């Protein structure tokens, strides 16, 4: 079936979303046009406004409509000397959902990857260096992903912390709650053994 230019453009635009291939994009486009034109208009409006009005927090670099996000403006969090380093704004949502952290964040928007040409300044480590130099951070919690790049990034940041005499800790990685050891991969199990906690 030959499709119109506008329909092709719509399907091609939908393919910019992660995990959306040609078939999924076609299904979405046809659904919006056949069954939910009102929803399509709302989606277009929300996307347009979000793209033009949402920027980055001047303190932590997460997404916000204001110059500074609500977490960074919270006086209680400002008094807490902990700074959690994450790779993306989605990681903040995950950490906040635990209810176990009451400090502030710094979002890298990625990780170090020399092979891809991503260096320290590309993920804001120059800004982090400046922020640690202000003296209001007592501990940095490194919550980068448990990947080779995430580990390398964490070690690099730990060196910056050392220069500023700021304590640096790494979140624990290991066997998930309810998991069975025989189903856990070797690398994860190795991290669990190395990061074990003393009970007595």
Curated annotation (Swiss-Prot):
<dbReference type="InterPro" id="IPR034137">
    <property type="entry name" value="TOPRIM_RecR"/>
</dbReference>
<dbReference type="Pfam" id="PF21175">
    <property type="entry name" value="RecR_C"/>
</dbReference>
<feature type="zinc finger region" description="C4-type">
    <location>
        <begin position="57"/>
        <end position="72"/>
    </location>
</feature>
<comment type="function">
    <text>May play a role in DNA repair. It seems to be involved in an RecBC-independent recombinational process of DNA repair. It may act with RecF and RecO.</text>
</comment>
<dbReference type="Pfam" id="PF02132">
    <property type="entry name" value="RecR_ZnF"/>
</dbReference>
<dbReference type="InterPro" id="IPR000093">
    <property type="entry name" value="DNA_Rcmb_RecR"/>
</dbReference>
<dbReference type="GO" id="GO:0008270">
    <property type="term" value="F:zinc ion binding"/>
</dbReference>
<dbReference type="Pfam" id="PF21176">
    <property type="entry name" value="RecR_HhH"/>
</dbReference>
<dbReference type="GO" id="GO:0006281">
    <property type="term" value="P:DNA repair"/>
</dbReference>
<dbReference type="InterPro" id="IPR006171">
    <property type="entry name" value="TOPRIM_dom"/>
</dbReference>
<keyword id="KW-0227">DNA damage</keyword>
<keyword id="KW-0863">Zinc-finger</keyword>
<dbReference type="InterPro" id="IPR023627">
    <property type="entry name" value="Rcmb_RecR"/>
</dbReference>
<keyword id="KW-0862">Zinc</keyword>
<feature type="domain" description="Toprim">
    <location>
        <begin position="81"/>
        <end position="176"/>
    </location>
</feature>
<comment type="similarity">
    <text>Belongs to the RecR family.</text>
</comment>
<dbReference type="GO" id="GO:0003677">
    <property type="term" value="F:DNA binding"/>
</dbReference>
<keyword id="KW-0233">DNA recombination</keyword>
<dbReference type="GO" id="GO:0006310">
    <property type="term" value="P:DNA recombination"/>
</dbReference>
<dbReference type="Pfam" id="PF13662">
    <property type="entry name" value="Toprim_4"/>
</dbReference>
<keyword id="KW-0479">Metal-binding</keyword>
<dbReference type="InterPro" id="IPR015967">
    <property type="entry name" value="Rcmb_RecR_Znf"/>
</dbReference>
<keyword id="KW-0234">DNA repair</keyword>
<protein>
    <recommendedName>
        <fullName>Recombination protein RecR</fullName>
    </recommendedName>
</protein>
